[in-house]
């Protein structure tokens, strides 16, 4: 699809139909509370790799985008996808109205599930975070996702989505790009090698290692291996005590947040510690804690992170390029990784997509 055709068809031809794909409201709670096996016992399912000509669905499971961001950021992202041979397909309910939600829960869940079930859609990249994913988790048909495994990417509020899909479906997902966020050269550099081997002329996966000794900080030295889990700290703690609670046992956990004061970060980390979540990890990678509001107290976010995490005696590094920042590293949820805090290295050891 050329750019002109795409821009002219954003509101109509690029939108999927509205056929019902949801479980009934009465069954939603039963789906939420259903027993599930410990998927961590089995190798994860890999979604198909991106390929030239593949259609990429762009839904809004949480908040919508402002009209000006749609015109500038989302269309810019769509153009970038076209530039690497992909075809963007935007859901109908993505532009924000008067609510903090892009659309009613049933509509957001339905549009997401339409992308899952549509065989013409090869991947799903969420449009933005904000709030709302938790509200639709009981409406997600996880069995349909298992039957139609696809690349699913998002961060921030979508921490709840990508981690839950991995847990319920044993499917690798991606804490990665969104359509209304920057898709700069750095972000593409650490996303495309994981998901688009054809574009990178890769015939097989090779270990992907990030190391920037000048920027990365070491809170606790050491080396650890584990499967990658994590995302936004606020969302992870919000899921605790629900059926979508994240199991951190043996994981390399990564955390980031935006706009939180040091004492609030302390409270969330303490909650995780009291629940045994931090002690269960093999290692921890700290992303960016941006727009931190430390005007009332002298204690900084960095001091808080050190005081809460150093006593764990597991490898912990900080200042990693992920979170609510322009340049973002993509974390494949469920893939085996190694954290080498001694040498300030983080390595993805397994393929994240099916070649």
Task: Identify the residue ranges that each predicted region occupies.
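Conserved anion/nucleotide-ligand pocket segment
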Residues: 174-234
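N-terminal small/polar loop signature for handling phosphorylated ligands or for N-terminal nucleophile
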Residues: 92-148
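N-terminal export signals
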Residues: 5-30
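Internal helical hairpin/lid segments
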Residues: 244-301
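Short, acidic/small-residue loops that bind anionic groups at enzyme active sites
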Residues: 142-164, 172-178, 312
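C-terminal segment of N-terminal export signals and the immediately downstream linker at the start
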Residues: 22-65, 69-71
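ATP/nucleoside-binding phosphotransfer catalytic cores, i.e., glycine-rich phosphate-binding loops
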Residues: 288, 292-355
């Amino acid at each position: 699809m050329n750019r002109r055709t795409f821009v002219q068809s954003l509101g109509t031809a690029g939108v999927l139909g509205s056929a019902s794909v949801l479980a009934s409201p009465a069954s939603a709670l039963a789906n939420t509370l259903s027993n599930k096996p410990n998927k961590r016992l089995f190798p994860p399912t890999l979604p198909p790799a991106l390929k030239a000509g593949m259609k990429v669905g762009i839904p809004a499971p949480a908040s919508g985008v402002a009209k000006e961001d749609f015109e500038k950021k989302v269309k810019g992202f769509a153009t970038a996808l076209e530039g690497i041979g992909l075809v963007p397909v935007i859901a109908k309910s993505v532009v924000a109205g008067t609510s903090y939600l892009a659309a009613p829960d049933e509509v957001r869940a339905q549009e997401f599930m339409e992308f899952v079930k549509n065989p013409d859609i090869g991947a799903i990249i969420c449009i933005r975070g904000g709030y709302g994913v938790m509200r639709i988790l009981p409406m997600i048909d996880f069995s349909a996702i298992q039957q139609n495994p696809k690349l699913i990417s998002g961060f921030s509020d979508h921490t709840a989505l990508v981690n839950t899909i991995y847990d319920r479906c044993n499917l690798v997902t991606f804490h990665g790009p969104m359509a209304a966020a920057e898709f700069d050269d750095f972000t593409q550099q650490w996303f495309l090698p994981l998901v688009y081997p054809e574009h990178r002329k890769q015939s097989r996966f090779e270990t992907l290692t990030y190391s920037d000794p000048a920027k990365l900080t070491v809170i606790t030295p050491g080396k650890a291996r584990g499967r990658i889990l994590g995302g936004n700290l606020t969302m992870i703690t919000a899921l605790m005590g629900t059926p979508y609670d994240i199991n951190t046992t043996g994981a390399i956990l990564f955390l980031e947040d935006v706009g939180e004061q040091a004492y609030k970060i302390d409270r969330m980390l303490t909650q995780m510690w009291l629940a045994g979540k931090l002690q269960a990890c093999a290692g921890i990678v700290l992303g960016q804690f941006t727009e931190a509001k430390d005007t009332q107290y002298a204690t900084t976010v960095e001091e808080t992170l050190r005081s809460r995490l150093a006593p764990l005696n597991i490898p912990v590094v900080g200042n990693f390029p992920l979170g609510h920042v322009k340049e973002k590293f993509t974390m494949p949820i469920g893939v085996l990784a190694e954290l080498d805090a001694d040498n300030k290295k983080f390595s993805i050891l397994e393929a994240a997509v099916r070649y």
